[in-house]
């Protein structure tokens, strides 16, 4: 049986909030089977829980937020959510003593290291996947994203940025997803932004944690970070990282093919909601026999060591 996963032990880290620029303490806790992914703000009294849910997602200019029925929000969840998807973590409680998850280095890699440090435990309960049965597509002007049936999880993402720092040959990235491929090829890709936007936001008291330490920063011509890029195509790899996190907001790894053109958080979420709203387009599946599981989701030894 393919089993649900949680953490072996509690781990903690500190980082800076993208919005406030203040120190944030992040605590990751194991959770029982069928808990799902729960984000929790402990700076509120009593603490407020935000279960990962496609319907709770709001896309703001700076990040992805989860918002509850009282309009309370937790911000900057997308990169940690991508790390959970990458390692197939089904059950976890994520606590922060702030309104936001720390931005760390702007990628998912610090969260991957933290999760691996906690260790990953299998629970004696079948892991539920969402399997795509019919093609579903959403559009917004010339942007689009779609899911097709496929026995695995593949992603094919194209961006179209007209910028000298982004070579036209580095605007598409495609991969067959696996925990190993996610860790090596995607998790280290950082978010990016324009220097002028960061300066403008900071002049208005926003994005106070934004810096060269947590993003690729560009002007109109070039990358301004001293160390340059981690990958030649880091921009499109990061957009794929975002998509992996966005699509895991249903709380389950997805079996299907994802293809997108110029998509972002809002359109990724619109696609996920469109799939879930169309009952005949998907189904929950479990795997009693390991041999039936798509190769994509076989855990590498590093994950379950």
Curated annotation (Swiss-Prot):
Give the reactions, separated by semicolons, that this protein catalyses.
Answer: a UDP-3-O-[(3R)-3-hydroxyacyl]-N-acetyl-alpha-D-glucosamine + H2O = a UDP-3-O-[(3R)-3-hydroxyacyl]-alpha-D-glucosamine + acetate
Q: Which residues bind Zn(2+)?
A: 79, 238, 242
Q: What is its EC number?
A: 3.5.1.108
| Top EC class of this enzyme | hydrolase
GO biological process terms, alphabetically, are: lipid A biosynthetic process
InterPro entries from the UniProt entry: Ribosomal_Su5_D2-typ_SF, UDP-acyl_GlcNac_deAcase, UDP-acyl_GlcNac_deAcase_C, UDP-acyl_N-AcGlcN_deAcase_N
For this UniProt entry, what's an example GO CC term?
membrane
- Which Gene3D superfamilies does the annotation name? lpxc deacetylase, domain 1, lpxc deacetylase, domain 2
Pathway annotation: Glycolipid biosynthesis; lipid IV(A) biosynthesis; lipid IV(A) from (3R)-3-hydroxytetradecanoyl-[acyl-carrier-protein] and UDP-N-acetyl-alpha-D-glucosamine: step 2/6
Name what cofactor the protein needs.
Zn(2+)
Which sites are catalytic? 265
- State the SUPFAM superfamilies in the record: Ribosomal protein S5 domain 2-like (SSF54211)
Give the molecular function GO annotations. Answer: metal ion binding; UDP-3-O-acyl-N-acetylglucosamine deacetylase activity
The record, for Pfam families, names:
LpxC
Q: Which UniProt keywords apply?
A: Hydrolase, Lipid A biosynthesis, Lipid biosynthesis, Lipid metabolism, Metal-binding, Zinc
Functional note = Catalyzes the hydrolysis of UDP-3-O-myristoyl-N-acetylglucosamine to form UDP-3-O-myristoylglucosamine and acetate, the committed step in lipid A biosynthesis.
* Family from the record: Belongs to the LpxC family.
The name under which this protein is listed is: UDP-3-O-acyl-N-acetylglucosamine deacetylase
Q: Which organism is it from?
A: Shigella boydii serotype 4 (strain Sb227)
């Amino acid at each position: 049986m393919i089993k649900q996963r949680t953490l072996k032990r509690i781990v903690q880290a500190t980082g800076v909030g993208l919005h406030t620029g203040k120190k944030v303490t992040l605590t990751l806790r194991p959770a029982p089977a069928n808990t799902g992914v729960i984000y929790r703000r402990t700076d509120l009294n009593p603490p407020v829980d935000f279960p990962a849910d496609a319907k709770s997602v709001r896309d703001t200019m700076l990040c992805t937020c989860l918002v509850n029925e009282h309009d309370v929000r937790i911000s900057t969840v997308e990169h940690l959510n991508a790390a959970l998807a990458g390692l197939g973590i089904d059950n976890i409680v994520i606590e922060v003593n702030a309104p936001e998850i720390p931005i760390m280095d702007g990628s998912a890699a610090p969260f991957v290291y933290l999760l691996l440090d906690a260790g990953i435990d299998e629970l004696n309960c079948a892991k539920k996947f969402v399997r795509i049965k019919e093609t579903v597509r959403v559009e917004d002007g010339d942007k689009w994203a779609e899911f097709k049936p496929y026995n695995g999880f593949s992603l094919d993402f194209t961006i179209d940025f007209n910028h000298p720092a982004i070579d036209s040959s580095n605007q598409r990235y495609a991969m067959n997803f696996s925990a190993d491929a996610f860790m090596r090829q995607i998790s280290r890709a950082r978010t990016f932004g324009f220097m002028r936007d960061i300066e403008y936001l900071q002049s208005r008291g926003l994005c106070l944690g934004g810096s060269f330490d947590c993003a690729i920063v560009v002007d109109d011509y070039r990358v301004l970070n001293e160390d340059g890029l981690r990958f030649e195509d880091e921009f499109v790899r990061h957009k794929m990282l975002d998509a992996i996190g966005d699509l895991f907001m249903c709380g389950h790894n997805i079996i299907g093919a994802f293809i997108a053109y110029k998509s972002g958080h809002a359109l990724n979420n619109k696609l996920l909601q469109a799939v879930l709203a169309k009952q005949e387009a998907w189904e929950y599946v479990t795997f009693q026999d390991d041999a039936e599981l798509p190769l994509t989701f076989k855990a590498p030894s590093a994950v379950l060591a």
